[in-house]
Amino acid sequence: MLFVYNCNPAVTMPDQNRVLRGLAREDLFTVVFDQVLTDSARWADVVLPATTFLEQYDLAKSYGSVNLQLVQPAIEAVADARSNVEVFTELAQRLGIEVSSSFATDPEALMHITDAMPDAIRHSLLQGGIATPPIPTCPVQFVDVFPGTPDRKIDFFPKSLDAEAPMGLYAFQSDPASESYPLVLLSPATDKTITSTLGELRQELATLQMHPDDAVARSLNTGDIALIFNELGEVQCPITVNANMKRGTIGLPKGLWKKSTMNGSTANALVQDTLTDLGAGACFNDARVQVTRMATVNLKDQSLSFRTGTSASKLVH
């Protein structure tokens, strides 16, 4: 059984085609607990509605901020939508797992968490909705805030990390690019989505960004349909020639849903499932690919017109 929550693995995980084959297994019972019908939810046997931040309690801290904020629901939960706390508490109870009664609902869980806080912070948070830690409100690096090293300096060569890295912290590694797959594929964040969140709102096709020199070498122009591929899969989408791109590097936004490309694959279909040497994270920006032209598209209405010598059958899989 697979229970998916706070995640959209069909489009956010490396080696996308392999992930989709796994989701398609007949012996896998999948439950997706989400706010919208994501690409992952389309593979689910059961879809459970989750609350949004407008319907639940939470504790939040934004990037770059030291303040803790209390999030309170603006509306009642819509229809049958439930929060993570409610769903997992009931799941645990049904599985016979003992759960503290203080975690039965969002407000109770919130009170349990704040009980462990210093009185001043707890009072400020519950009464005013925001808590400021007992440090200067505008900390300045190397004036009143320092790295946690013995000498309070930045350590560029920590011995513990050097020992943990299989090849050493700063060992040279050759570029994995090859003659068959010479281009670096990056999948940067955009102002359209937060990873894959809000991906359902994107109406237009995503475009591949490529430097003019790389485009000329492949007889590509803005508006052409590009086939981006390697040994793992392929992605089909329009191209935009962009002089701001680095030569040898192409870009396709991260967080895309299947509807944002012409064949339903995203950049993660070209990313291997190898792990980083430190932290065991995914290597999302380590893919090497090749790009060829397939057709021409009007980027305003996104209608296709195939160029001489390009077979429409190439778009059918």
What do these predicted regions represent?
Residues 9-18, 58, 62-65:
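Glycine/threonine-rich flexible loop motifs
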Residues 109-200:
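Long, low-complexity segments enriched in small/aliphatic residues
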Residues 1-11:
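Short acidic, glycine-rich surface-loop motifs adjacent to enzyme active sites
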Residues 78, 83-129, 196-209, 213-317:
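Long, contiguous, secondary-structure-rich segments that constitute the structural scaffold
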Residues 19, 25-29, 33-36, 73-93, ...:
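Phosphate/diphosphate-binding loops
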Residues 37-71:
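Flexible glycine/proline-rich, aromatic-decorated loop/lid segments
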Residues 4-6, 31-34, 49-51, 157, ...:
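Generic beta-strand/beta-sheet core signal
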